[in-house]
């Protein structure tokens, strides 16, 4: 498929997961096609973008291609440094912005790809990602609870063990 065809298949309100690091493995031709389609037609709009690592060159490529009010509604990212325009949207409260550990996001994407319902991990407890702290929220527009604290009862050798 050509980048334009891929961009045309992204519906309004879709969740798009991106996998790259800086400019390495960046699907810039596809991101450019999505940007061009939005600027020409106003679609797709209200996307949720998920990325584990920083994507782009810090100027025009990567997540910066998606940094338009209306194109993106929510970003869940592990590293925002390479996308100053997306950072600006988050700072101005024009998108819901969340940040979680990059490894946890990568593992979550693997779980989703395998058809499993989510990720259970201790990573992030006691940090900004902990639901008892900020729950990964970076601004006031980020009003959803994307993570939750779970407690488990372990039964080993017929006896209950509490962590």
Give residue ranges: language-model regions.
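Conserved alpha/beta enzyme-core scaffold
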Residues: 1-163
């Amino acid at each position: 498929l050509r980048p334009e065809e891929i961009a045309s298949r992204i519906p309004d309100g879709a969740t798009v997961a991106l996998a790259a690091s800086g400019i390495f493995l960046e699907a810039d031709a596809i991101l450019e096609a999505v940007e061009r389609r939005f600027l020409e037609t106003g679609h797709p709009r209200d996307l949720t973008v998920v990325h584990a690592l920083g994507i782009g060159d810090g100027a025009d490529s990567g997540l910066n291609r998606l940094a338009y009010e209306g194109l993106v509604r929510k970003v869940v990212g592990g590293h925002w440094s390479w996308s100053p325009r997306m950072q600006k949207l988050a700072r101005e409260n024009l998108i819901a912005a969340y940040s979680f550990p990059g490894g946890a996001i990568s593992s979550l994407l693997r779980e989703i790809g395998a058809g499993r319902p989510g990720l259970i991990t201790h990573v992030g407890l006691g940090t900004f990602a902990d639901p008892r702290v900020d729950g990964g929220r970076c601004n006031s527009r980020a009003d959803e609870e994307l993570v939750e604290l779970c407690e488990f009862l372990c039964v080993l050798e017929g006896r209950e063990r509490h962590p």
